[in-house]
Each structure stands twice: as structure tokens, then as C-alpha cells.
Amino acid sequence: MLDLKFVRTNPEVVKEALKKRNSNVSLDAFLEQEEERRKLLFEVESLKAQRNTVSEEVGRRKKHGEDAEQLILEMREVGQKVKNLEDKLGEIEQSMEAVLYEIPNIPHESVPVGADEEANVEVRTWGTPRSFDFEPLAHYEIGEKLDILDFARAGKVTGARFTFYKGLGAKLERALISFMLDRHSAKGYVEVLPPYMVHRNSMIGTGQLPKFEEDAFKVAGTDYFLIPTAEVPVTNMYREEILEAEQLPIHHCAYSACFRAEAGSAGRDTRGLIRQHQFNKVELVKFAFPENSYEELESLTRDAESILQELELPYRVMALSTGDLGFTSAKTYDLEVWLPSFNTYREISSCSNFEDFQARRANIRFRRAPKAKPEFLHTLNGSGLAIGRTVSAILENYQEADGRVRVPKALQPYMGVEYIG
């Protein structure tokens, strides 16, 4: 979340950011509450000072055997006023906190300004989409023909947007996970295997709650949520901690299953692996010095790109516009892989710098020196990559006319075969 002091002293900056993001949060009402809060706080402090003065006078009179009854009654009245004002102050602060949690991050100055994804800017492309001398199939058609993906039986067992991976399909999924973790670990990322359930405070810390609760799977009768991404548990590993400067930067990579309700996506990508309720992903998470976080974003994006390059999958990098930027992000690059069945690029990774937005929510700080005042660090993360979408891209881009799928060279040591089918 944003710093309350920053919002109070820079209301026009925040209003402009909200406008660029097409946010309907009312900052004027929030600022009116802040003004009332400050007045009440001043009144409470004044009354407490008055109560302390009266209390001292009561003590003095009792010490000298003088009557203090009237002052005692006066002190009780002041105490009741303080309680009433503090109750009102608590209500206002609770209301303000709720609004503060609804205010999105302020876009970095380099983010393209625009209403939606149409304003996203292509930064670079890599590779050339393949020209087929036959009619290419969609990944779900390939998977069903090769009997490595079973959507029908998953639908029978669970419902729509679930999949059984079978045989070499399951092995391909597992190979990709190991390949990605190996490559990222070799670059200095420390591997983490996180819990797949977290409690509400963790979801608040990374920004999924309270705003996006309808997109989350909550475990009935508990305070647990199934994680939508490893970003949530890995970022919250350091929640409520003060790190030392020598610990930074921290780089983690983590494989996890991810669970998303996909509320509001009815009718979109209903077939195949593109938009599932459960999918696997390798996540990259960074904790950085504020002054270095944008360099860290560029390197994080390159690390995600390197996986696509080794797999020889054509892709492009898009800088998201203010209207398409995620709620918690200050700047995001999307990596979009070429999918022949769509005849276009589709998102396979989002790499974001949240600056101190998540760190404030999760209270993750660091000290530059042993006795220095703690500061909020910057958090970043990105998919490195989404496994199901990578499977989709491999099946479609590596399909052969005879129905087989060639295994990318980088994966052959993990798969032990050159072809699927």
C-alpha cells in the first residue's frame, strides 16, 4: 500500500495516478477523513494533557489534606471524553485503512500512459514465428491425439478448466519444472518449495486481498487460501522482519501449483491449458535495495527470457500501460510467446517491480547499518515460467506433419527422447 504521509502531502500526484489507472477510488473522501483524524488526534492529546495536569493537582491536594472531589469528577469526565474520541478515532482509522488498501500502486514515470492493453508498448522481439507447410493444430488437439492431455476425464473428476497430464505429457511438465529451476538456480536464485496454503494476512501482504478475494480459492471453515502464485508465500517469508543490508539482494526461485478461480473470465480460453483453475509455475522473487530495484527488474526479465530462448520459442516483450498495469505493480513487462493456433503472441510471464508497495503491506524492512533506522525494501517477481503455457507453446511450435512433437534440444536430457508420439 502507499505511505499515508505521501498520500496526505501529495494528493494531486495520487489523483493523477488513479486517473491514469482508471481507478474509481475516491481520494477526496479519504483526505477529508484524514483531516478529521488529525483534528481528533490533536483533541485527544490535548485532553490527555489536561487530564494529567488535573491528576497532578489531585495528588497535590490529597497530600495536603485538601478537598479534591470536584477535580476527581472533572478528571472522570475528561477520561470519558477521551474514550469517546478514541472510539471515534478508531472507526475513522479503520475506514481509512480500508480505503488505503484499495488504492493501487503509483505507476513509474517510464510506464506508457494508456487506457488498456491496446496502449501496451512492444519493447523487443526474439525469434521468428515458424511457417508451417501443413495446417498446424492447437495444443489441446495435439495433446488429445497423442493421448498426453485428457481434458474430458479431468472434467468428469473435477470440472471445467482442469487437466490430466499422461505419459510423456506428464514427463514434459516435470522436465520443464526441473529445467527452469536448474537454470535459475545456476544464476544465483535460491530455490524454495513453499506451502500451497496461506492465511489471510499473507494474501493481504502481497495485495491479493482484500480487493481480489473473488479470484481466490478459500478453504471452507478455515482462514486458509490456496495460493494463486508462489509469489504469495515466498514474499511473505520475510513478513514482519527487519533484514540486514548484507542480506540484500535476496533472489528466490520457487516451483508451486497455483490455484485461481478466474472470476470474470467466463467464455475466455475455455479450451486447453491457457486459463486453468490449477496450473504449475516457476516463480522468481526478489528483495532489493530501493535504489537498485529497476536494475533488478531488467535482470529478472532477462532471466525469464533466457528460458524461452533456450527452448527456442519466439516471443516478444511488452511494457504494460498504466491502464493494464496490475494493482500492486509500479512497472511490468509481459513476455508473450508465439502460439500458432492463435496466430498471435500470448502472455507466458509477467515481470514486475512493486517498489515498496508490498513491503509496506507485509512490513518487510531492512537496515543500511546496524543502528540505522529501518527502511522498506523493494520487492519484485516474475514467472520463470508458467508451465502449462510453456507446454502449449512447445506442442504448437514443435509439431510435425506426421503428428509427432519434437522435443526442444534443451529438454532432451530431461526427457530422454527426441520426439513425443
UniProtKB/Swiss-Prot annotation:
Entries under PROSITE patterns matching the protein: AA_TRNA_LIGASE_II
Family to which this protein belongs: Belongs to the class-II aminoacyl-tRNA synthetase family. Type-1 seryl-tRNA synthetase subfamily.
Domain of life of the native organism: Bacteria
Protein name: Serine--tRNA ligase
Function: Catalyzes the attachment of serine to tRNA(Ser). Is also able to aminoacylate tRNA(Sec) with serine, to form the misacylated tRNA L-seryl-tRNA(Sec), which will be further converted into selenocysteinyl-tRNA(Sec).
Localisation: Cytoplasm
A Pfam family reported for this protein in Swiss-Prot or TrEMBL: tRNA-synt_2b
Listed GO CC annotations: cytoplasm
Source organism of this protein record: Desulfitobacterium hafniense (strain DSM 10664 / DCB-2)
Residue numbers binding L-serine: 229-231, 283, 383
Residues reported in the UniProt entry to bind ATP: 260-262, 347-350
Catalysed transformations (reactions): tRNA(Ser) + L-serine + ATP = L-seryl-tRNA(Ser) + AMP + diphosphate + H(+); tRNA(Sec) + L-serine + ATP = L-seryl-tRNA(Sec) + AMP + diphosphate + H(+)
Class of enzymatic activity (EC top level): ligase
